Curated annotation (Swiss-Prot):
GO molecular function, one term: metal ion binding
InterPro entries in the cross-refs: YjeF_N_dom (IPR004443), YjeF_N_dom_sf (IPR036652)
Residues that hold (6S)-NADPHX according to the record: D73, N74, G75, G76, Q77, G148, V149, G150, L151, Y152, G153, H154, E177
Name of the protein in its database record: NAD(P)H-hydrate epimerase
HAMAP family: NADHX_epimerase (MF_01966)
Source species taxonomy: Bacteria, Pseudomonadati, Pseudomonadota, Gammaproteobacteria, Legionellales
Organism listed in the record: Legionella pneumophila subsp. pneumophila (strain Philadelphia 1 / ATCC 33152 / DSM 7513)
Length: 270
């Protein structure tokens, strides 16, 4: 049986375990910001640092990493990861997809993402604008920070081409929140998707990681609660008994967990 942890208490990942749709996850995020006064920037920084912590724990010998960042909040998490990776002695390279470095905030980019992008630039982290003909080098690990839960509709052709290119690498792929191309609520592929070696997700378990194609494409799952108060999970109820979660859905998953009561990552074993 697989487990994930909620405030130090092991719970089975099965039909009785609360998991969340994207709309419910967004409610949790709103509560964190509005009721518990945790800013969007703070949440972004907590998640990016947690992702880097897991990366180091899971692949301790990796040095050269390539982080593919979109222009949304998922990309912001990738920028935070890049900064943390440099502090920990790694050599991060950021590939900017659909945007580029700018001294003024680009249209449609959140202030927090722009802040973290500029922080990377100021710290001397390599920032490259991605193009289909550019040489991606020889990374030892790839980080997928393209869309996360923010994917709507099908993956655009130029992104699909990038995903196919990345899938040809024979190195580990760490997805932040949700593998690009996987619907975080349904687990279905949005035209094309990037299969991850592991996915780290935050605040709550997303249903799409546990069902349909998402179960396969997410690889191992790491979960970090971002220091969320226990009361928040009572305010927004997850899916406790879902017909979408049958008895065979989650039992083949490796799920790492960490919360504010724990210092390190722990792994559930079937």
């Amino acid at each position: 049986m697989d487990y994930y942890f909620t405030k130090g208490k092991p719970q089975l990942v099965n039909m009785k375990t609360p998991v969340y749709l994207v709309t419910q996850f967004q409610q949790l995020m709103d509560l964190m910001q509005n009721q518990y006064q945790v800013s969007c920037l703070e949440l972004m920084q907590r998640s990016g640092k947690a992702a880097c912590d897991f990366l180091v724990y899971r692949w301790p010998k990796v040095k050269k990493i390539s982080i593919f960042c979109g222009r949304g909040d998922n990309g912001g998490q990738g920028y935070v990861l890049a900064q943390q990776a440099k502090k920990m002695g790694m050599i991060p390279t950021v590939w900017q997809v659909g945007h580029q470095m700018s001294m003024s905030k680009p249209p449609q980019m959140h202030e927090e993402v722009w802040y973290e992008m500029n922080s990377c630039h100021q710290q001397g982290i390599l920032l490259h604008t991605y193009s289909p003909d550019i040489d991606l080098g020889d990374p030892e690990l790839i980080v997928d920070a393209l869309f996360g839960v923010g994917l709507y509709g099908h993956v655009r052709p130029e992104i699909a081409s990038l995903l196919q290119r990345l899938q040809q690498f024979t190195v580990p792929i760490l997805a932040i929140e949700v593998p690009t191309g996987i619907n975080a609520s349904t687990g279905e592929i949005a035209g094309n998707a990037l299969a991850a070696t592991a996915t780290i997700t935050f605040l709550c378990m997303k249903l799409g990681l546990l069902i349909n194609d998402g179960k396969i494409y997410s690889g191992e799952i790491a979960f970090d609660d971002l220091l969320a108060p226990e009361a928040i999970y009572q305010q927004v109820k997850g899916i406790e008994k879902s017909s979408l979660l049958d008895s065979s859905t989650c039992f083949s998953k490796k799920i790492w967990y960490r919360n504010k009561t724990q210092k390190g990552w722990q792994l559930s074993i079937n």
